[in-house]
Amino acid sequence: MYILRSCMEKKVLKIGQISDAHIGDDDRLVQDIDVRKNFLTAYNSESMKDLDLLVLSGDLADNASTDAYSFIAGVIKDSKVPVCIIPGNHDNLEVMEKVFDLKDKVHNGKCYYRYDLDGRSIFFLDSADGTVSSDQLSWLEQETAKIDGEVLLFLHHPPCLCGHKFMDLRYSMKNIAEVQATLSKIKNLKHIFVGHYHSEMTIQLEDKTVYVTPSTQMQIDPNITVFCLSSAAPRWRLIEWGENFMETKVYFSNTP
């Protein structure tokens, strides 16, 4: 958790992050877990009230089905706050485009964009294929250079190894070095929020902090090299971001 309080000129933004919901078809369980119930537990939790923005940071669906995306679309359609979405490695962007309003967010088959909120800028990248394309990296470097204040970044894959023995070994980002080279140039980026690893982790990457948000589907034991489910209870993140101020907390339900 990073906290630095000072005389703040702008309001503190409350951002909710839900990651790796892995919604299946119909009401079928995914790996014997009621993933729809888990998603609703997070979405309807008291911690997600009075948000300024909700971020769904990839792996919305388990098998990229229209039915899964339609379920999520039905849940968020009456949201009183904007919802920003990016795909993960289990998602299919073409199917997502048929269900969600991603107008002006998809470029050459990748979903990446900037979202401005209360005078601050939040960036979203597409790492669904396990990489962040050079086009996205060039765009990110150019766009962040136009901004005087601090920015936030969301993407699905962590741009670093995290000490997660199972995920680092099998499913880490494929072009970490290239991504880190670009990120190191962006001095007004201090906080990066990701998912993918089904664990809560906080990693220091030079002058930036990478916050790995756990899953609403299930959690994976980070301490062994083979897959081992450590919990089927949903977890999600609340971010409070102000001027020279960042506070973030992961919430969880005790019952799956």
Swiss-Prot record:
Its EC number is 3.1.4.-. AMP binds at H22, D59, N89, H90, H198. Keywords: Hydrolase, Iron, Metal-binding, Nucleotide-binding. Binds 2 Fe(2+) ions per subunit. It comes from the Bacteria. InterPro entries: Calcineurin-like_PHP_ApaH, CNP_phosphodiesterase-III, Metallo-depent_PP-like. It is an enzyme of class 3 (hydrolase). Fe cation 2 binds at D59, N89, H156, H196. Fe cation 1 binds at D20, H22, D59, H198. Its cofactor is Fe(2+). One of its GO terms (molecular function) is nucleotide binding. Belongs to the cyclic nucleotide phosphodiesterase class-III family. This is Probable cyclic nucleotide phosphodiesterase Fisuc_1441/FSU_1912.
